[in-house]
């Protein structure tokens, strides 16, 4: 099969798969909204500042398959890509990040597939966030489909830093000297980390 696109048969299967990923994303999102609401009512505390949801675009999915030198098939997406559906949970404080993540992880109808804690172990460029991949059941007429959703938990300050770092890295009109500031970015990241203890 051509590695650049889906066959006509797989295109229909791909559209159906994306509907399942969207359902999984909304399932996790609803669980998070319920947890946030409970915290507001019971504890007068709003741990989630806001959430952002997204499904990877077709081009992003195809690009990731190519970078990983994987075949462009629906099976390859199901077996190898765990971030097609994603939610970013922006919390007020670092303690909120872990509390919300732990309460969500404890729910008995979802499974934790993978955890990468870039808060305790930041990336070399200073990036901090807690990434958890969950498998959540999506109930369709054909039955339950356990589907992965990547949830990135971070504080407002960590989110601001990640946005700034992303803009600096991918902004094309910056001189090379501006792009080569990893030490400065790590220092900013550490300062942001200390702000929201």
Residue ranges with predicted function:
Residues 24-29, 33-70:
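Surface-exposed, low-hydrophobicity interaction/linker segments
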Residues 40, 73-82:
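Short, flexible, solvent-exposed loop/turn segments with mixed acidic/basic and small polar residues
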């Amino acid at each position: 099969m051509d590695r650049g696109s889906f066959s006509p048969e797989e295109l229909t299967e791909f559209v159906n798969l994306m509907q399942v990923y969207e359902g999984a994303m909304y399932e996790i999102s609803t669980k998070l909204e319920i947890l946030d609401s409970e915290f507001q009512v019971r504890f007068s505390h709003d741990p989630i500042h806001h959430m952002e949801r997204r499904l990877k675009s077709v081009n992003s999915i195809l690009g990731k398959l190519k970078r990983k030198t994987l075949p462009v098939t629906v099976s390859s997406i199901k077996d190898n890509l765990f971030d097609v559906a994603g939610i970013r949970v922006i919390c007020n404080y670092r303690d909120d990040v872990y509390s919300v993540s732990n309460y969500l992880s404890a729910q008995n109808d979802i499974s934790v597939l993978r955890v990468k804690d870039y808060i305790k172990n930041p990336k070399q460029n200073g990036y901090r966030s807690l990434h958890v991949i969950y498998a959540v059941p999506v109930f369709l007429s054909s039955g339950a489909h356990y589907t992965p959703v990547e949830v990135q938990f971070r504080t407002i300050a960590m989110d601001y830093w990640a946005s700034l770092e992303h803009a600096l890295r991918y902004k094309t009109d910056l001189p090379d000297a501006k792009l080569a500031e990893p030490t400065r970015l790590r220092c900013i990241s550490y300062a942001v980390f200390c702000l929201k203890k």
